[in-house]
Amino acid sequence: VILFNVKEPEQQEKEPEEIQAEVMQNPETMTQTAENIEDKYKVFDTMSEDWGSDDLEGFVFYDLPEQYADKGYFPEKMQIYTRCLCKQNDVPYALVLAIIEYESGYEFDKTGDNGNSKGYMQIYEKWHTDRMQKLNCIDLMNPYQNVKVGIDFLSYLLKKYGTVQDALAAYNYGERGAREHLWNNGVYVYSYNTAIMQRMKEIEEVVGK
């Protein structure tokens, strides 16, 4: 028996306007889309706003740069929480914002390095299991836990190496990697830490130090 494959007629690719029109004509599709978007951001409701007036003193809401506004999301509650952690850990708030911008473009659910680097600060989970356990952070895709781990790591690096540029190199390469690939070769300033330090200065003009 010879079986013949019957080729279906090729469907023409629909124009964006046609797709939008179909969605507008289907209220159920619109509802499902809205629900999916709402579910995605529910994680931001998992943190209580238990900060006081002292924590809010000097706070300036940071509007995301236009190029990150579509995919990025960094709501006021997240900004206040991040700023509070920075103050507690003696880490420059503008530095953390610059790292988040560079690493994830303010996409809290972003993954990189084949899924190993996660969240706002692109934490590579394999190298931070002890830190996560210490901080009781088990989910790096939770934005609050992600920045808590990242800021704690930054605090450690800043205290150990003394400068933002070296702390950033160790954040980027890992301490051993920075030593072997950069410092042992006399390299201390390179594209990664240069870009972030420049953005940190620019962001400081908006949110302060």
Mark where each language-model region is:
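Catalytic glycan-binding domains that act on GlcNAc-containing polysaccharides
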Residues: 47-209
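N-terminal export signals and maturation junctions of secreted/periplasmic proteins
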Residues: 3-81
